[in-house]
């Protein structure tokens, strides 16, 4: 029966489940101390790094980063959506899943059962049909044939055509005002802010549907056929599409071959499709963003090796360096990354069509550089290691980056190579990394989650998502050459601006220095509360320190209030209340990173953060009242509040019963 699954039932189901039973029915577990271990079912490995904790009712893989509760495991392992996983686990537990009708006051449930999915799927079908039969399709067909694409590849990637005109899709799908509003939310329509006129976002373009890991269409890319700009146009950010997390072609690559050994990262849709046309069905592309740590995390869950294939110009080399930075924190032992730069004026699309698959593969094998070689070669462009000053500068640049590598063996080998170049012992390198200035192009904290992307998303944290059925649907120094052997540096004068450039674009831009990760206090408080929900009961009133403009503070308040209203909920039950949302992803990422770590003085740190947030909100309120008093007359209530703030004796400013 269709309908919403009550949150109370989901809480009860999770409470009844034993994650060891759930996982062991699908994966052979071995008892190791108080936990259980196995080879991870989500990526290839020979040494077990997958751990299940019966105490925490949580699983985590130290190799690929997969983790979550029993419900999440079944979703990922069995390839089920949320309601199907609930049904499966309820059936195993002998429970019947109740259903209830949605209430008017409920907010839209996204992205678990978002109405955007069927709408985007319908739009994709419209574009595909237009490519087959629209009167204006000839330009699109000629373009695709001119790129050497077969009908089979066009079908596999779902290619389509957005006809010229302002309202083709609008007329086809926008039957009423409400439907048009959903189309705007999905990025299919644009609404003029002044006139209110609505029109198709994609017009006269070859269309590339973008799919998530389950094959659901979440966005589109369009390549213009005429002279309009931009040449390539992506869907905007939506509740179901986040550019910094998705990779074009990953779903198609995995669908074609579930046992991939390496994935090629290229720069555009046509590069992915051109390689697929030539039989290389293992390429992906980012969606108008730099390669992020989230991208690498996803890629290394699928394959042990990543090849970055970029243009050899300055932009391509800058993109490669940023990809290298994102790769470092994901380099567990057993993983590898390579870099291939193409001849000037060429891209994978043009090159593979010109020289063929065999020659292109030979180019990869002969000219790609291991990450370590590329790393030291590029730093050698910035710091001339033939002088003592250059050696010191190179050590300063390299040390903090090397310490980002989690794989102990690779990290030590990188230290050893830096010693061969600079003469510094590995211990000195480690010490130098700890002293590095806190300026970096790398994320300031937890590399496993894109917190900046989270900050642009504004759901209602107080709204507990309900769930219904949804479509199923990455003395003389030596210079490493391409083979990795040693050879002396050239006697030619060092030219900092020689071809290839420095790893970053602006000459006056600070070189990359990576500090030890520092987590913002609010995220630390969220993490602590997840592992110790009973702390919420000691907070008297969370609402007074909520900063309406700060997303993490809002989530902290919502989590405290949820734990206070339901004091018996476990950590996993709390996280499940935000399942399928961006805040749920954040909570899970926080829980995964520290679920086996025990810290001292957690309670004191938690209430120190609460006190700090209270003080910050008090200062903000004081500033707002003072500003208003200079512009207009305050009300009696505002005057009383201002006096209280000035005396630092505002009611309810003590957040805990103990006065913390």
UniProtKB/Swiss-Prot annotation:
Keywords: DNA replication, DNA-binding, DNA-directed RNA polymerase, Magnesium, Metal-binding, Nucleotidyltransferase, Primosome, Transcription, Transferase, Zinc, Zinc-finger. GO terms for biological process: DNA replication, synthesis of primer. One of its GO terms (molecular function) is DNA binding. Its EC number is 2.7.7.101. It catalyses: ssDNA + n NTP = ssDNA/pppN(pN)n-1 hybrid + (n-1) diphosphate. Mg(2+) 2 binds at residues 311, 313. Binds 1 zinc ion per monomer. HAMAP family: DNA_primase_DnaG (MF_00974). Monomer. Interacts with DnaB. This is DNA primase.
